[in-house]
Amino acid sequence: MTADVKSAAARILSTDSSRDPSFNNFSFTPFLRKSFGFGLASDVPVCKAYSEGHCPLGPACPDRHPTPSRVTTSTTTASGLAPSTTHGSLVCKHFLKGLCKKGLKCEYLHEYNLRRMPECQSFSRSGYCPNGDDCLYQHVREQARLPPCENYDQGFCELGPLCSKRHVRRRLCKYYLAGFCPEGKACPDAHPRWSENLPKPTMRVEKTEEELERERALIREEQEREKEREREWRSERGRGGGFMRGRYRGRGRG
């Protein structure tokens, strides 16, 4: 038995994984390559569309989609801009209207995905949007802005509904608990981080009716100021057009 262990160890140590591609392959390797592009050979070319901002094929693209940390040389687009890492998760508002002229060079996504739309400014300020359900932007509730409760994510929070943080009801991922989940961050189930030094949960502070009314009054005042600024801008624009209209009479005679 000892001889078998020694021979197996010697065989593993003497194996060159770079020459034997099947040495580090697992049963889930094809899934990772197809879904996330992990493990692609270095001789596979980098996707040109992805390097310019966005690839419509996504994970199904046969070429490599390197992350910014893996890129050794700074690739730039024709406009002189590097592929965006901050706007690449937001949908282009001009594309939704059919008015984007950048095409594949646009720093934003060209797809119909409401979950990746920017946040609605009107709803975020006042909790009300005049477009309602027809609005193309995200309506983020105040409760959704709270950070998740670490104690609840690990199974139990002693404060329950009185906790000042958000309690997200998700079942634990059985694959993550077993050691590895092939879905990674895209997994719909919870991947809790176990820690012994979690902060103690705090009580949620309920606002009084006077405080809520004061906030509503401030929001109404801000909306009125915005409407006033818009009216002034339109009136200035109208006066400018009227001022220039009719001034030019052409070249005079003689």
Swiss-Prot record:
GO molecular function: RNA binding; zinc ion binding
Name of the protein in question: mRNA 3'-end-processing protein yth1
Gene Ontology CC annotations of this record: cytosol; mRNA cleavage and polyadenylation specificity factor complex
Amino-acid biosynthesis among keywords: no
Highest taxon, organism lineage: Eukaryota
Residue ranges covered by zinc fingers (C3H1-type): 41-68, 91-113, 114-142, 143-167, 168-194
Stretches with biased composition (Basic and acidic residues): 203-239
Cited function: Component of the cleavage factor I (CF I) involved in pre-mRNA 3'-end processing.
